[in-house]
Amino acid sequence: MGYEEIKNTIATIEDFPKKGISFKDITPLLLDHKKMNFIIDELAKFAKTIDFDIIVAPESRGFLFGLPLALNLKKPFVPIRKKGKLPREVISQEYELEYGKATIEVTKNDIPANSKVLIIDDLIATGGTTVAIQDLVTKLGSTVVGQAYLIELVGLCDYEKLQGKFFSMIKY
């Protein structure tokens, strides 16, 4: 099993969700437990090179990789949710999308102050979600020490804005 096999399993859907977008559909990977285990193992290899306390991942596809990785490494997992989805007191962060604004939230006490945080997500493009997560973590008095992604859309992100050690498996 290798990265090329993983890349060849990801479906590219042209003009979805709108014209000019090449959507990377990871659903075919979810159908193959061996490939998913390989991905989690590769993310774990990277994560083991970092001293961190907590894994966070954004809704919803980030959960598919963040939680299994946290279980694999016996670390806490904290979900980053869309606005209005968490029942307890939250910290919010608004950020820009290409078509407007969005807000993400985390439950206030789930990331203790001075925690070292690892961000996991399925894909990084412009980095907008990642920077918003970094801002949330900072508001809670903690630090992002690393981030890892299954897919990186190369050249779209301002990498200078990203905090900590960076890893991506598949590049387009």
Swiss-Prot record:
GO terms for biological process: adenine salvage; AMP salvage; purine ribonucleoside salvage. It is an enzyme of class 2 (transferase). Keywords: Cytoplasm, Glycosyltransferase, Purine salvage, Transferase. SUPFAM superfamilies: PRTase-like. It comes from the Bacteria. It is found in: Cytoplasm. GO terms for cellular component: cytoplasm. One of its GO terms (molecular function) is adenine binding. PANTHER family: ADENINE PHOSPHORIBOSYLTRANSFERASE. NCBIfam families: apt, PRK02304.1-3, PRK02304.1-5. Homodimer. Belongs to the purine/pyrimidine phosphoribosyltransferase family. This is Adenine phosphoribosyltransferase. It comes from Malacoplasma penetrans (strain HF-2). The lineage of its organism: Bacteria, Bacillati, Mycoplasmatota, Mycoplasmoidales, Mycoplasmoidaceae. The gene is apt.
